[in-house]
């Protein structure tokens, strides 16, 4: 019940997953992952399937939990907003060689990664989705 309260689900202890929203299911999964007070929390595309507002809220929740519980966060994601909001250290893997091509802070890598593909990927974050005149 305490872990559910941490993720904003106090009062939903008796609900089934089908009875709550997608964002609430993600938060319930996070509470379940925290049940044994791990030192490391692993996330695999945590905001997949969420709308941008719910994704941002989940990012904020992950940061709050990291800070309050002192847990290390390891996350696999393609969501640029999440990378820049949560990450203080990133590792990029080459899809062909399966080797690390860059690692460091995402803002620094966006500017100066040796691998141009890493720079291009991270710079998409600053590119508007709709071009204006």
What are these regions (language model features)?
Residues 41-44:
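Catalytic Walker B motif of ABC-type/P-loop ATPase nucleotide-binding domains
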Residues 16-20, 24:
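Conserved ABC ATPase signature
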Residues 35-39:
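A short, proline-enriched helix->beta-strand linker immediately N-terminal to the Walker B motif
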Residues 52-54:
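Helix N-cap at the start of a conserved alpha-helix in ABC-type nucleotide-binding domains
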Residues 96-122:
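Conserved beta-strand-loop-alpha-helix hinge in the C-terminal portion
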